[in-house]
Amino acid sequence: DSQGVQQAVRVLFFHEQSAALAELLRDSRLGWLANITGDNLVGSVEGSGWMGAEGLIKPLDIKTGLSDLPWHKDCGQGRHSYYCNGLTIGISVTGADERSGALGVVPGSHRAYVQTARRDPSLDLPAIKLVSQTGDLTVHCSDTLHRAYPPIERPRKVVYTGLQQPLMQGDLIEEVPVEQQRATRARLTNVRDRIAGAAGQDSL
């Protein structure tokens, strides 16, 4: 933050740390989303079909790091075929509004040929902020252009999980040890600086 204090903003593999969350991710109220698009999606935990999750904390006064990302698509660092064939689901822990870092999205951008980082000013698709209350769900395709607005009055907490297309017969995905997955995620601390167009993207 502006005082130079490092703040934890993500809880990776949160479903492994919270029995309550692990139970919630198996709840039928979430499970029905698997077929909301007619694609019979499955969870992202390798080999199980269950949904995994990570917790996000949006503190006040954060200056760098993974908390408040500018406009981007989740495949901006690659792996489009893996990240963008399903849905990202946000479970609102605190709710979000104009003052507490609501998620910004550009509806329809998942079907448009646009840059994976920054919002092109010539794009004729309007952006909106998803105002939510505690317990609300947000659902978007990861290929949708979206951003995390910095909270200015109250911090925000949210849990993100996801659903993806099941593997087809003959598909093989290299198994990556959990320790390596954790190390890879830990190295993404400067991803904000690598997203093009970070400056000047604070307004809709």
Question: Each PLM stretch: what is its role?
Answer:
Residues 55, 89-91, 159-163:
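A structural signal for short, well-ordered beta-strand segments
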Residues 59, 93-95, 163-165:
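Non-catalytic surface loops within mature trypsin-like serine protease
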Residues 137-139, 144-204:
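Non-heme Fe(II)/2-oxoglutarate
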